[in-house]
Amino acid sequence: MFIPPVDDVKPIPVPVEIYTQCITDASRFFGIDAELVFTLFDNEGGKVGTFSRNKNGTYDIGPMQINSSNLPEIRNHFPSVTWRVLAYDACASFWVGTWWLYRKIVDRKGNVFEGIADYNSKTPKVRATYIFNFMIKYNRRIQRRNGMDELYQWTQPKPQYNGHIVKNLPE
């Protein structure tokens, strides 16, 4: 069982330059849309040095909030990656988190959103809430990236020109 360190070190946010570069590189390597990984990081809310205790006694570690129950499997693939690395090396956390997401998507036969839900939980109710919140944040990221609200645009009738109407003319 994983027991986090007892210290007075406060978790610190990951600098924008670090998470931008590391997520971009890792997502490109694993062939995952970087916006999905950025959204996952945003949704998880982790920081360098974060240890979040779960109801089942496990911990979510570091910026990508990788669950401590996954440490043995991670060690099989990345022998030098320990909980300390995941907690305190932001870039390593992003690479391992992106790899973990990639594995979850592959396990779900390419279903991205099922893979994202699996990244967070196996509990159906928790998964449903998580993926709902994830999709809202993902849509906002896409809107910002594209400079428009894609979903809103698709669901609204096309604007029509009704002629030039002048209001508030002096009498």
Predicted regions mapped to residue ranges:
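Catalytic glycan-binding domains that act on GlcNAc-containing polysaccharides
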Residues: F2-I165, P170
